[in-house]
Amino acid sequence: GVGDIFRKIVSTIKNVV
């Protein structure tokens, strides 16, 4: 769902940081 997409984005940002 939309929440899954948002969590995926957050995970990607955390990986960059």
Curated annotation (Swiss-Prot):
The modification Valine amide is found at V17. It is found in: Secreted. InterPro entries: Antimicrobial_8. Coiled coil: none annotated. Keywords: Amidation, Amphibian defense peptide, Secreted. Expressed by the skin dorsal glands. This is Uperin-3.7. Pfam families: Antimicrobial_8. GO terms for cellular component: extracellular region. GO terms for biological process: defense response. It comes from the Eukaryota.
